[in-house]
Amino acid sequence: MIGRLRGIILEKQPPLVLLETNGVGYEVQLPMTCFYELPDIGQEAIIFTQFVVREDAQLLYGFNDKQERALFRELIKVNGVGPKLALAILSGMSAQQFVAAVEREDITTLVKLPGVGKKTAERLVVEMKDRFKGLNGDLFNNTGDIQLPASNSSQISDADIEAEAASALVALGYKPQEASRLVSKIAKPGADCETLIRDALRAAL
C-alpha cells in the first residue's frame, strides 16, 4: 500500500494533482479543502495517501495529514459511502465542519452535500458519531475552520476558468447543470479556479 508520497508537483487540475517521486508521476485525487493548501506547481509537497482498488481502476486519494486520511477511511466504511462520495463530502466542508454537523445531528446541512440524501445523512450521523471517539487531534476540534491561502491567477479567460471550476464540481459529484449554476452564481472577474470552486462549495451549503 502507498501511504505517503513526497515529490514535486507537476500538474494541478482540481481535484487531481500529478506528483513526481523518483521519476514516477502519481495521479492523486484530493478533497478540495486539501487541494487549496497545496504549494504551487514546481514545488515540493508531502501527501498522505489512501490506495483504493476497484474492478476498473486503481486510485490514490491524498490528504494533508494523517487525521484527514483517517476520517476518509472511516467515511468509506459507512454503508452507501464510497471513495467518490467521501471525497465530495470532504470537499464540500472542512473536516471540522463535518464533525460538527454530525455531532449536532445537522441533517439539513449534510443533505446539501453532493450525493448525500436524507437517508445517507442519517446513516452518517448514526455511524460516524461513534467513530469520532477513536479519532483524536486538533483536526477534530469542531470550533475551527480551514484557512484557504490565496492562489495565483492564471493568464486564461474568465470563461475558461469558470468552465474548469464547473468541471471540477462535476468530478466531485454535482450534476453539470447544478455545477454551472453554482459557478455562475458566485463568478467574478479575475477570480482563479480554486477561488471559484471554494466559493461555489460554500454557496451550496
From Swiss-Prot:
Q: Which UniProt keywords apply?
A: Cytoplasm, DNA damage, DNA recombination, DNA repair, DNA-binding
Alphabetized Pfam families for the sequence: HHH_5, RuvA_C, RuvA_N
Chief place where the protein resides? cytoplasm
Q: Which GO terms describe its cellular component?
A: cytoplasm; Holliday junction helicase complex; Holliday junction resolvase complex
Name the CDD domains for this protein.
Answer: UBA_RuvA_C (cd14332)
Q: Does the keyword S-adenosyl-L-methionine apply?
A: no
Which Gene Ontology BP annotations are present?
A: DNA recombination; DNA repair
For this UniProt entry, the molecular function terms from Gene Ontology, in alphabetical order, are:
ATP binding; four-way junction DNA binding; four-way junction helicase activity
Residue span of region Domain III: 157-205
Q: Where is this region: Domain II?
A: 65-143
* UniProt subcellular location: Cytoplasm
Where is region (Flexible linker) located?
A: 144-156
Write out the ranges of the annotated region (Domain I): 1-64
Keyword set includes Cytoplasm: yes
**Sequence similarity:** Belongs to the RuvA family.
Query: Which function does this protein serve?
Result: The RuvA-RuvB-RuvC complex processes Holliday junction (HJ) DNA during genetic recombination and DNA repair, while the RuvA-RuvB complex plays an important role in the rescue of blocked DNA replication forks via replication fork reversal (RFR). RuvA specifically binds to HJ cruciform DNA, conferring on it an open structure. The RuvB hexamer acts as an ATP-dependent pump, pulling dsDNA into and through the RuvAB complex. HJ branch migration allows RuvC to scan DNA until it finds its consensus sequence, where it cleaves and resolves the cruciform DNA.
Subunit structure, as described in the record: Homotetramer. Forms an RuvA(8)-RuvB(12)-Holliday junction (HJ) complex. HJ DNA is sandwiched between 2 RuvA tetramers; dsDNA enters through RuvA and exits via RuvB. An RuvB hexamer assembles on each DNA strand where it exits the tetramer. Each RuvB hexamer is contacted by two RuvA subunits (via domain III) on 2 adjacent RuvB subunits; this complex drives branch migration. In the full resolvosome a probable DNA-RuvA(4)-RuvB(12)-RuvC(2) complex forms which resolves the HJ.
Q: What is known of its domains?
A: Has three domains with a flexible linker between the domains II and III and assumes an 'L' shape. Domain III is highly mobile and contacts RuvB.
Name assigned to this protein: Holliday junction branch migration complex subunit RuvA
